[in-house]
């Protein structure tokens, strides 16, 4: 019994010593945990600030593109150098997780991957900004549309009131066409803004066009004359116009006497002759 009591007391003493050692270890690790928590909060605040800066940059870019052309300028070399310097400073600082001891960070804690967040870094020769154009006045190379515009405007007429010249110079709008709810009305408005086309009487054809117009008029006159001649000609009939069929001798003069025909239809021929000679018919039914 005494041995059992002594062993129980020894076990209790061991347990008390273990609890004390655990409390001591906990007190030792508390400042490290506090420093870890403070680092986590600082990293979160840093990420929040970076997101706010990114949103501000986007808003500023959108506001600048509303007043300036977004495709007219490139990022200045000063901005590229600043980006490179900031990136080098970030690399020189190193990751804060490497300073921590391996006893308290097993590699799966939040602090171990906190420094691997998204780094706001603009790529080189890719970022297009209108504010850079305002600050450094670095003009972007001419595009294909600008080159075509200059080529067309170089051949413009000397007349300043030409509608083609005004369409290519003053009528060209750099801002894109934005259609609202009533897109048809917007299109009509843009169409009404175009200059009016002059009348055909005001247009003077050049020498080449005048030659072609005169040739067309001559050909039209020749074809018209042929049509008029054809219509003026008398229509040819199949039978002669002055032909007169033979009539009975009673109604004709002595120069054109025609003897009465003796055919099977004697009765009808005598009736048509109009003579007063009496008709003697033995077979009336046969004649009828």
UniProtKB/Swiss-Prot annotation:
Residues 159-196 are annotated as: Inka box. One of its GO terms (cellular component) is nucleus. GO terms for molecular function: protein kinase binding; protein serine/threonine kinase inhibitor activity. It is found in: Nucleus. It comes from the Eukaryota. Inhibitor of the serine/threonine-protein kinase pak4/pak5. Acts by binding pak4/pak5 in a substrate-like manner, inhibiting the protein kinase activity. This is PAK4-inhibitor inka2. The lineage of its organism: Eukaryota, Metazoa, Chordata, Craniata, Vertebrata. The gene is fam212ab.
């Amino acid at each position: 019994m005494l041995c059992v009591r002594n062993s129980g007391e020894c076990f209790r003493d061991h347990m008390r010593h273990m609890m004390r050692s655990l409390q001591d270890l906990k007190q030792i690790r508390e400042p490290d945990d506090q420093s870890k928590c403070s680092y986590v909060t600082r990293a979160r605040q840093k990420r929040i600030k970076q997101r706010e800066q990114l949103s501000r940059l986007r808003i500023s870019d959108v506001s600048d593109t509303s007043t300036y052309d977004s495709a007219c300028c490139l990022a200045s070399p000063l901005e590229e150098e600043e980006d490179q310097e900031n990136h080098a400073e970030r690399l020189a600082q190193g990751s804060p997780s490497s300073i921590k001891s391996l006893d308290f960070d097993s590699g799966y804690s939040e602090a171990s991957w906190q420094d691997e967040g998204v780094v706001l870094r603009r790529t080189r020769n890719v970022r297009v900004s209108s504010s850079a154009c305002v600050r450094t006045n670095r003009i972007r190379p001419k595009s294909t549309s600008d080159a075509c515009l200059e080529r067309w405007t170089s051949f413009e007429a000397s007349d300043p009131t030409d509608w083609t010249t005004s369409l290519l110079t003053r009528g060209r709008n750099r801002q894109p066409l934005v259609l609202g709810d009533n897109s048809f009305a917007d299109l009509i408005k843009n169409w009404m803004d175009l200059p009016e086309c002059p009348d055909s009487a005001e247009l003077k054809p050049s020498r080449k066009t005048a030659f072609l117009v005169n040739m067309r008029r001559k050909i039209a006159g020749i074809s018209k004359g042929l049509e008029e001649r054809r219509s003026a000609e008398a229509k040819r009939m199949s039978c002669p116009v002055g032909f007169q069929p033979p009539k009975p001798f009673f109604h004709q003069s002595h120069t054109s006497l025609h003897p009465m025909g003796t055919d099977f239809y004697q009765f009808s021929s005598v009736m048509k002759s109009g003579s007063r000679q009496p008709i003697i018919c033995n077979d009336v039914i046969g004649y009828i």
